[in-house]
Amino acid sequence: MKASLLNKLDNLSDRFEELTALLGDAEVISKQTQFRAYSKEYAEIEPVIATFRELRKVQSDLEGAQALLKESDPDLREMAEEEVAQAKEALTTLEDKLQRMLLPKDPNDGRNVYLEVRAGTGGDEAAIFSGDLFRMYSRYAEKQGWRVEVLSANEGEHGGFKEVIARVEGDNVYAKLKFESGAHRVQRVPETESQGRIHTSACTVAVLPEPDEQAAIEINPADLRVDTYRSSGAGGQHVNTTDSAIRITHIPTGTVVECQEERSQHKNRAKAMAWLAAKLQDQQEAAAHKEISETRKLLVGSGDRSERIRTYNFPQGRVTDHRINLTLYSLSEVMAGGVEAVIEPLLAEYQADQLAALGD
């Protein structure tokens, strides 16, 4: 293991001892905010320290076994050789585990997200596929125990959505969905196609982390134009006699958000403002992320909304993620909500990319 990583682990060990003492201090215990902060830090460090201590023990066992290799007794040497081999194998496993534990954490991983699915090229078929994609993510969310709340939906003339925006709430939503942003292409025979020809259509997906309330971007009310209109689509039959739907335009950036799913204009406005904050924060972070990507070209996670990331080929039952050259012939399972078959390899590849950067 690199000296810099060992030094970092030694520093973490010192901090862990310090936190242990602080959490037993009566004065700290009486200050709930401080106590919670220390407890959270302790919980994050504790698994790393436990693994580091295990590594130190294995290193000690290895040194002891290597010393026995010098013994004249052949049976003792044979036993020592086995112990050395086992210790070296355990050491490699623990070093790899520790390196992964020390990878930089994405501060947004634990956040809820705003999921945007929009029809691109392909007309009615693109809208229908947008509906299929949104259904895929909704079923995946259900399997994860997440909650999906539609904020705005513009339905297609023949089904699906021209655009659908939803808030997805649960544990580690952004961590799982953050690499879904980009252009998704579908190849299939549309229901409206009489001659059986395969058409190619596209949709774009954007996944934006919901900002922390305390760290949320400041928005000047003078920079906003707020329009109200009568709601349509889901729930519209209940509220279409009043202007309950809200459209907010952030004038400096031209960013527009709207929410029409609640019967209350006040609730729609609150949800639209939260979504606007997420979009503005995403725009700010995109510039910084672009610099990182250009410095060291990331295999996944470029975040480019226009980048074609995946193809769904229905005649072949194939789904291909172009970023990691992953091809699966289980399209029906993926579309039924089993998208983890694509997400998990993406996350593994990203982690490998981080490990490579750690070694540079």
Swiss-Prot record:
It holds the Pfam family PCRF. Methylated by PrmC. Methylation increases the termination efficiency of RF1. It is found in: Cytoplasm. Keywords: Cytoplasm, Methylation, Protein biosynthesis. Coiled coil: none annotated. The modification N5-methylglutamine is found at Q237. Transmembrane segments: none annotated. Disulfide bonds: none annotated. One of its GO terms (molecular function) is translation release factor activity, codon specific. PROSITE patterns: RF_PROK_I (PS00745). It comes from the Bacteria. One of its GO terms (cellular component) is cytoplasm. Peptide chain release factor 1 directs the termination of translation in response to the peptide chain termination codons UAG and UAA. Belongs to the prokaryotic/mitochondrial release factor family. HAMAP family: Rel_fac_1 (MF_00093). This is Peptide chain release factor 1. The lineage of its organism: Bacteria, Pseudomonadati, Pseudomonadota, Gammaproteobacteria, Pseudomonadales.
